[in-house]
Amino acid sequence: MSEAEARPTNFIRQIIDEDLASGKHTTVHTRFPPEPNGYLHIGHAKSICLNFGIAQDYKGQCNLRFDDTNPVKEDIEYVESIKNDVEWLGFHWSGNVRYSSDYFDQLHAYAIELINKGLAYVDELTPEQIREYRGTLTQPGKNSPYRDRSVEENLALFEKMRAGGFEEGKACLRAKIDMASPFIVMRDPVLYRIKFAEHHQTGNKWCIYPMYDFTHCISDALEGITHSLCTLEFQDNRRLYDWVLDNITIPVHPRQYEFSRLNLEYTVMSKRKLNLLVTDKHVEGWDDPRMPTISGLRRRGYTAASIREFCKRIGVTRQDNTIEMASLESCIREDLNENAPRAMAVIDPVKLVIENYQGEGEMVTMPNHPNKPEMGSRQVPFSSEIWIDRADFREEANKQYKRLVLGKEVRLRNAYVIKAERVEKDAEGNITTIFCTYDADTLSKDPADGRKVKGVIHWVSAAHALPVEIRLYDRLFSVPNPGAADDFLSVINPESLVIKQGFAEPSLKDAVAGKAFQFEREGYFCLDSRHSTAEKPVFNRTVGLRDTWAKVGE
């Protein structure tokens, strides 16, 4: 497939193609502008892939700019986390990391220009009064009594704000546009507010901070952004974006284009709700493998390639829709099926003893991937006592059950055919040991007499087993749209994390965090980066071998 054929097609790329063909632009310059007040989630991944992907495909540039205009909510911890997430996803920003705070001096000068043009004024209404005066979707707003102050008075008052002469909430700078506008965003929006808080980049230099809508468009223009891409909730804000740039002296006027945000089933994207999950300890942190954060997905075992593929598949449109969780899971399942080496682990172990097996044991050869001989093979120890999964044995079963049944045969993966002879139980009637015999002439081959053995189960040698903790992660919520519930916390899936103590083949003692494996017949797993120790590895289930939720929804 050629490079052109491999590129996704969407309405934004069509606009860019037209702009380049007409000569409106000779290059493409985009940006990704997160606020450093939290961790990025899968919705941000869509924006990252769009902005950086466009720059990559058109051989342009993409800036990473932190919209750091609210020092109360922001932290350098989030800055570093976001930079790490962007790089982990496989993208690199153009030049240095940028901050909106880099432009605070220019933004202040542009605010003064608007005051001098009679297009901005210092308002002393309280925040509550400003909301009241703004009106509603059906009722126009009304002018502030401070709206008609002179230019000189507004300049003096704005300087007083700058010098710390007002308390927080006692004054702000507003644009003078139209309080009767059908668009609430155009009803004299606030441009600057007072916050006595230390800023992670500028320290205590400023006590007035520009609002997002004032900062964003000017930052785009100062950086020479050609296509400013944002989600649909900012559609009305485009009017203010254009108004600001039309009324200041700036040589470049970027254009804003909106696309639909990513909504994903069985999770929430609201920063407030995600924060509540963390602070109320429903999850163990922002990187909990059940969270939709990029750090959570990474810890769970999602690869950057699978997330990029997911963003490519869902596409870019202007129509809001909700994506099935199965779509995301399908991307990682396909990736790991292709690339993850195989290993054996028993999640719910029961002891199996092969009574006629002689000797200390032996090594059996197993391929690391059944379809990729280039991935090599490994030696796995086999002995007379092994662990198998409790679900792989029944005393009685129908013909559909293809695993081990009392009096019948099954094959041990890449080893021998065995037959269950008897069981031993505890006082409560639970099976503690399964006693078997084996056919010594069936190591990785069919029985010589031609009898058919259909079932295959996995196993781990008891003498060589690595004790492991296995964390079976599942969807965090039990309903597709938890955000619609009166209390979204009430629909948390109680089975979203089930912890098991099992055994794994000894090769897994060399596993490293983030390295994925297919535990044969169980699913895809990776070593946990937070809880694993050399003595007790912890493996997280990334995704099952198939979509078990599909049956639930039928």
From Swiss-Prot:
TM annotation in the entry: none
Enzyme class: ligase
Position of sequence motif 'HIGH' region: 34-44
UniProt keyword Ribonucleoprotein present: no
Annotated positions binding L-glutamine: D67, Y212
Record EC number: 6.1.1.18
Keyword flag Protein biosynthesis: yes
Reaction(s) this enzyme catalyzes, per UniProt: tRNA(Gln) + L-glutamine + ATP = L-glutaminyl-tRNA(Gln) + AMP + diphosphate
Motif 'KMSKS' region positions after renumbering to this chain: 268-272
Alphabetical list of Pfam families matching this protein: tRNA-synt_1c, tRNA-synt_1c_C, tRNA-synt_1c_C2
NCBIfam families (UniProt xref): glnS, PRK14703.1
Cross-referenced PANTHER family: GLUTAMATE--TRNA LIGASE (PTHR43097:SF5), GLUTAMINE-TRNA LIGASE (PTHR43097)
Family listed: Belongs to the class-I aminoacyl-tRNA synthetase family.
Name by which UniProt lists this protein: Glutamine--tRNA ligase
Organism: Shigella boydii serotype 4 (strain Sb227)
